[in-house]
Design a protein with these regions (language model features):
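Acidic/aromatic-lined carbohydrate-recognition and catalytic surfaces
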Residues: 62-126, 201-207, 212
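C-terminal beta-strand-rich structural cap/linker in extracellular carbohydrate-active enzymes
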Residues: 387-408
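Carbohydrate-binding surface patches
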Residues: 281-284, 289, 328-369
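Carbohydrate-recognition beta-sandwich/jelly-roll modules
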Residues: 1-57, 91
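The substrate-binding groove and active-site-proximal loops of carbohydrate-active enzymes
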Residues: 25-40, 68-78, 134-150, 177-191
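Glycan-recognition surfaces
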Residues: 112-146, 150, 192-299
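Active-site groove signature of glycoside hydrolases
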Residues: 59-71, 152-181
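Solvent-exposed beta-hairpin/edge-strand motifs
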Residues: 366-383
Length: 408
């Protein structure tokens, strides 16, 4: 009963995938560059982090940054991939890469599978009522087919030769889709097929940090982290979307090592939206930025990065442990989140999704604090200090956030 109450019953049976390092801070190319990703731009972003962010508090407690290539990396030669990894290492970074193991984006049934001569893609699709299963513009493939394992082996060998240590595995739900049948006759459900495929993924990629995206929640023990809100960008609606997922999914950092709030994008947003989006990241889990920091990227977004990604006290919050909502019975997205740390400090964040100022009063006991004691507060974006006893009076500007460090 105690494990269930602490949201850890599943973790007792299937513990999270091991990870003895700090929560990842970093960059992912899909936030802005997307298919405009090139080898020179990737090097420039790595250099920008080294020269401008890593020495200004944008590093995890291991003093590392994870610099990730998303979709589009396959335009690089193998030599360029290796050189990118080497540049990252020289810059005090871990290189990351991307793959979608359970999809066929070409949707060309007659295409030959080069990993296993004699097979075509039509041989590995998952079929429902005789038709290929399609989702998000891609056909789903059978995780139990030997050709899919051959692809995993080949891709893993490339990633390891290049030296990648982090991989984002995307569109994983395709591997869990239901089908008329699977290559392995013992598989009878989509999740059984997905679990089979994840065992293979662990076999070939298990020594890398694995981050899942667009994936089933369970089974959870094959990856260190899972994205809880996909395609969250820069606006307040993206922050609200992320925090809606955190409201109901905060507990997933008990079955994964960390939650993933998606890339933090700063471009074309107000100062308040920037503060809110960064805060939504640090209170959720891994802390990955996504703007174009190459030489061709805008001066404005680089200035924003220097302003909003380098707040030492904000960044120190990001230890990988998710905040949880203060309330859970609202009709709209929750906007108050709290975390109690082992050293006795509490953190309390209030988001304002609206276009007008928000004023509210919060009872300290609702935050798990002793209402008979007086607490010292510091709002970490403004640096303003105050005290509170019994209740906390909060004012949040339109489309903005405040986050307090609370100590006795």
């Amino acid at each position: 009963m105690k494990a269930w109450k602490n949201t850890q019953a599943n973790a007792v049976i299937a513990p999270p995938k091991a990870w003895d390092k700090a929560v990842p801070f970093g960059w992912n190319s899909w936030g802005a560059l997307q298919f405009n990703l090139t080898y020179p731009k990737a090097l420039e972003v790595s250099d920008f982090y080294k020269e401008n962010l890593q020495s200004h508090h944008f590093v995890n407690s291991d003093n590392l940054v994870y610099t990730g290539l998303d979709s589009g990396w396959n335009s690089f030669s193998e030599e360029e991939l290796k050189a990118f990894v080497d540049r990252c290492k020289a810059n005090g970074q871990i290189a990351g890469v991307y793959w979608t193991p359970f999809t066929d984006w070409a949707k060309n049934p007659e295409r030959e599978i080069k990993e296993i001569p004699g097979y075509k893609y039509k041989d590995v699709y998952l079929y429902a009522n005789g038709k290929p299963q399609e989702l998000d513009g891609a056909y789903a493939v059978d995780p139990t087919h030997p050709a899919i394992e051959a692809m995993m082996k080949r891709t893993s060998e490339l990633f390891h030769r290049a030296g990648f240590e982090y991989v984002k595995m995307d569109f994983m739900t395709h591997g869990a889709m239901e089908a008329d049948k699977w290559y392995n006759p013992e598989i009878q459900t989509g999740i059984q097929g997905y679990n089979y495929g994840m065992q293979l993924l662990d076999k070939y990629f298990g020594d890398m940090y694995i981050n899942l995206s667009i994936s089933p929640v369970f089974p959870a023990h094959y990856a260190q982290s899972r994205r809880i809100a996909c395609d969250a960008w820069n606006k307040m609606k993206d922050t609200e979307y992320t925090l809606n997922a955190l409201s109901y999914g905060w507990w997933q950092d008990k079955v994964y090592q960390f939650n993933d709030p998606d890339h933090i994008v700063l471009r074309d947003a107000t100062d308040g939206e920037n503060r809110a989006r960064v805060t939504s990241g640090v209170i959720t889990g891994i802390f990955i930025a996504g703007d174009d920091f190459s030489k061709g990227g805008s001066k404005e977004v680089k200035e924003k990065a220097m302003k909003y990604l380098t707040n030492a006290e904000i960044n120190a919050i990001a230890n990988g442990e998710s905040f949880h909502p203060v309330d859970g019975n609202g009709e709209k997205s929750e906007n108050q989140f709290v975390r109690m740390d082992k050293d006795g400090k509490a953190y309390y964040a209030v988001f304002n999704y609206m276009d007008q100022e928000l004023k509210m009063t919060t009872a300290l006991e609702r935050l798990g604090l002793d209402s008979s004691k007086e607490y010292r507060l510091k709002e970490l974006w403004s640096g303003i200090e105050s005290t509170a006893k019994t209740n906390l009076e909060v004012t949040v500007p339109a489309c903005d956030v405040v986050i307090f460090k609370v100590e006795e």
